[in-house]
Each structure stands twice: as C-alpha cells, then as structure tokens.
Amino acid sequence: MPVAVMAESAFSFKKLLDQCENQELEAPGGIATPPVYGQLLALYLLHNDMNNARYLWKRIPPAIKSANSELGGIWSVGQRIWQRDFPGIYTTINAHQWSETVQPIMEALRDATRRRAFALVSQAYTSIIADDFAAFVGLPVEEAVKGILEQGWQADSTTRMVLPRKPVAGALDVSFNKFIPLSEPAPVPPIPNEQQLARLTDYVAFLEN
C-alpha cells in the first residue's frame, strides 16, 4: 500500500522515497501497486533524479499505465522537466487532480521548481521583462513582482522590467520560504523579449552540463 505523506520536508520526502523503493523491491513478482509507482515516480521528479524516473517509467507494466491515468499525468510533468520547460511544468502540475498520496509531492515539486527558477534568474540576468519572469516562476505578474521586491530586487513599472539583485551567498529567501543556492556567475546583459525564456532554458542546460 502507498505510504502516507506525513510532513512536507526534505527529510520526510527522502524517507518516503526509500520506503517506496523498498516496497517495489519487495512486491510480489516485482510488480508494485499503482499508488506506490505514482509516489515513487513523483518523488524521483522532486529529487530531480531523471535517470531513475525514466527507468521506473519504462519498467511499469503497460497494463498498469493504461489503467491508471495519474501515472501518465506524473510522467507528463517529467517530460516538461526533461525539456526544461519551466512554464510547462507549472501548467501540467496544475492541470491534474492528484490523489491525496501524490498531491503533497507535486506541490513540493512545483515549489522547488519555482525556487530553482528564481535562483537561475538571479544568477543569469541583470534585467528581464516582468511577464517573462512571472511565467518562469509560475506566478501572476503582480505576485511575482511583489515577491522580488521583498527580496531587494527592483522593478520598473514604466518599462515593466525586473532588475535582479546580485546574489549574496547564504541569502534567505523570505518570500519563497527557502534558502536559494547562490553562486557568482558573470552578469548577463539584457536580451530581446522573444529570447528570454529560451535563454533561461539554455542557461539551465549549461549549469547541468
């Protein structure tokens, strides 16, 4: 049976991941239940473990996949992650009605994606159009701008540009309630609107290589 999600913390999610992996290993005939597969697949995505996520998706029996649409929904989120489609990640997560055992994991994944996007923008840009920034962090423009102002960033209402503050190692992210991993990359000059999200996607690829 699936493991109940008791607390939304990094420790509890790691413990839950270990439990789900053990349940799959100990399952009769090596075939786990759909809820266990769902939790395990979502947890691999949460931990950005795309290799294990892909291997798990391949070994889930086709009959279980076809009979449990939630598994396909989780994997569709994984495909957006694989494509580094940040706006698509939020859209796909929000488009599904998740089960109570998967919902907390997907909410944590959405929040982790948002924090990662926030950190990437702070590292990669000296300025970015507010609408593009909002799409990248998956928030309404007004809410996104409010959050960055609380972080000490600047926003120009006339040009609708957001001006990230240069990261300071160990800075606490109050608005998103997490520490954001920071580094000291060279600043990147502004680029045209239509290239913003593509440039951010390329920057993600650069960091991961």
Curated annotation (Swiss-Prot):
> What cellular-component terms does GO give this entry?
COP9 signalosome; cytoplasm; cytosol; extracellular exosome; nucleoplasm; nucleus; perinuclear region of cytoplasm
What domain of life? Eukaryota
The entry's localization annotation reads: Cytoplasm; Nucleus
Q: Which UniProt keywords apply?
A: Cytoplasm, Nucleus, Phosphoprotein, Signalosome
Specify the protein name.
Answer: COP9 signalosome complex subunit 8
Q: What does this protein's UniProt record list under function?
A: Component of the COP9 signalosome complex (CSN), a complex involved in various cellular and developmental processes. The CSN complex is an essential regulator of the ubiquitin (Ubl) conjugation pathway by mediating the deneddylation of the cullin subunits of SCF-type E3 ligase complexes, leading to decrease the Ubl ligase activity of SCF-type complexes such as SCF, CSA or DDB2. The complex is also involved in phosphorylation of p53/TP53, c-jun/JUN, IkappaBalpha/NFKBIA, ITPK1 and IRF8/ICSBP, possibly via its association with CK2 and PKD kinases.
User: From which organism does this entry originate?
Assistant: Homo sapiens
Q: Which InterPro entries match?
A: COP9_CSN8, CSN8_PSD8_EIF3K, PCI_dom
Q: Which residue ranges does the record assign to the PCI domain?
A: 8-179
Provide the family line: Belongs to the CSN8 family.
Phosphoserine PTM positions: S175
Subunit comment for this entry?
Component of the CSN complex, composed of COPS1/GPS1, COPS2, COPS3, COPS4, COPS5, COPS6, COPS7 (COPS7A or COPS7B), COPS8 and COPS9 isoform 1. In the complex, it probably interacts directly with COPS3, COPS4 and COPS7 (COPS7A or COPS7B).
Upper classification of the source organism reads: Eukaryota, Metazoa, Chordata, Craniata, Vertebrata
Query: What is any Pfam family matched here?
Result: CSN8_PSD8_EIF3K
Biological processes per GO annotation: activation of NF-kappaB-inducing kinase activity; COP9 signalosome assembly; negative regulation of cell population proliferation; protein deneddylation; protein neddylation; protein phosphorylation; regulation of protein neddylation
